[in-house]
Amino acid sequence: WLMVLGARTLDDRGEVLLYRGDTLDVWTLVGPIAGSGRGGLGEFGYMWECPDLFPLGDRHVLISCPQGIAPQGEDYRNLYQCGWLAGHFDGAQFEHGAFHELDRGFEFYAPQTTQDSQGRRLLFGWLGLPEENEMSQPTVAHGWLHQMSCPRELFWQDEWLCQRPVAELEALKGERTRFEGTLGEFPGLAIDSAWLDLDLCGEGSLWFGAVAELVWQQGRITLRRQNWQRGAWETRSSPWAGGRITVLCDRSSLECFIDEGRHSLSA
């Protein structure tokens, strides 16, 4: 058996530790396989949480959540980050490339994956950051807090880790409405939930009620939302190569898959 464990060293460096065990009761430390100051990352957070190491195709992927990374322009905008490293794992060492954010939205953390009976690698993420805002969430009055993401299938596209809603969600679709051509405005739709496939060009925006807006312009997709605690508008954005955008929305959340799943934005 192999186990990966997120860690924080005594000198505040985040690491992912590898353990090996003949049973699930007794484990032996093999050593760190990734972390701050390792694999060409430089200083990269004081703690790494929630690691998940798995094979996908002919490579291995390590998903983890570093804490203590400062924002860099439009990157690393959340309190804690979540991303992936791809490379080769030989059972003891993990040679990998650069760190990439798994979801560039407001709330996405601690994802875990599993392999299903069809051999697909499926991921669920936790939509629930940051914790200092938890008790101000309006759902607290109704006895619940946070939610899981939709189940996502992971796949490679041009050596990039991509995500898409699992095919089984297609069965939940109801009546279809189609808009074609160039539209300055189209009528508002009163819906509780929707699956939107957007083929866009030029510049424009799509409102979700009065509290969230998806904005597209050359090379960039931006998700704006009104913070429920402060009332201020805040943004997260992603590169956009002009490909299809799929949005899953309901009363509580938005999950946007950009360029056929190359990037995602959740809120």
What label would you give each PLM region?
Residues 82-267:
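Beta-rich accessory regions
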Residues 12-18, 70-86, 132-134, 150:
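Structural motif
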Residues 8-11, 41-44, 73-78, 142-145:
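Short consensus segments that form the blades of beta-propeller domains
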Residues 12-13, 45, 192, 241:
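Residue-level preference for beta-strand/loop junctions
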Residues 20-24:
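Conserved Ser/Thr-centered positions that define the repeating blades of beta-propeller domains
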Residues 5, 26-52, 69, 92-109:
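Surface loop/turn signatures of beta-propeller and other carbohydrate-active proteins
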Residues 10-12, 38-42, 52-54, 61, ...:
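Flexible loop/turn segments at secondary-structure boundaries
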Residues 1-11, 16-19, 29-31, 50-54, ...:
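Hydrophobic core segments of beta-strands in well-ordered, beta-rich domains
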